[in-house]
Amino acid sequence: MTPELTFSRLAGGTRSAQLLVVGPSLGTAVTGLWGECAALLDGRFEVVGWDLPGHGNSLAATGPFTVPTLAAVVRDRAVALAAGRPAAYAGVSLGGTLAFEFADDPGPFTAAVSIASAPRLGEPRAWRERAALVRRAGTPVMVTSSAERWFAPGFTDRSPAVASALLTALSKTDRRSYAWACEALADLDPSNAVRPTAVPLLVVAGAQDVVVPPEVAEVGARSYAGVSCRVLPGCGHLPPAEDPAATAAILDGALIDEDAA
């Protein structure tokens, strides 16, 4: 099925020279994940984020969905949002898998950035087991383990409000939508062939990410000819929240369209 996604403006406006669409990680609300980073991009981009089904501001899903279906919805909405301006995409984890979709079929996007992600994330069996657990017990059952996986050591002590907001959003996520998102990740079946990209693609990894370690992100980058992987020191699985300034600097360097500036 085609899910309904809610898009929210995080920074800038329609007079901004470029559009940047940003995507969330599984279990997060895009405003909590990207809000501070988006504010640092204000003036150069109109930053618009989308929420996964049943997450943040998006309605709960009524049936299963796939990563390519999510990409199609985001691609189509970006055409209208861009209104002829240059448009770029950046996403984290599950949201980052869409960057690989756009590297092959970009639609309006002229560049894409995948953060803490890879063309295939984890093992299908583990995703299906997690889906079954959350259907049975709800998303609060994921809070403790996610706190351990999401953040670099010491982050929750340094930034307790940010970590708490992200984990609260996880606990409020619709259980069926979360489970279907897990199954969408289980169903990812990327090509093993090295291929060119239709638009520039950058892969970014957190140096202390235990979910998608830098070496896994680098393997994903090597799936595409000429694509490099940048590593953010001190970050775990959610760099836009853990180090908004460093993430914004990478996006500025990778995505600024000089013709539109």
Residues of each region from the PLM?
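Conserved alpha/beta-hydrolase "acid-adjacent" motif
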Residues: V210-V216
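Short beta-strand/loop motif that positions the catalytic acidic residue
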Residues: T197, V203-A205, D209
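Conserved HGGG/HGGXW glycine-rich cap/lid loop of the alpha/beta-hydrolase fold
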Residues: T2-A60
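Conserved alpha/beta-hydrolase catalytic His-Asp/Glu region
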Residues: G122-R125, A137-P196
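Gly/Ala-rich beta-loop-alpha elbow adjacent to hydrolase catalytic centers
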Residues: G91-G95, A99
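Flexible "cap/lid" loop of the alpha/beta hydrolase fold
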Residues: F100-V143
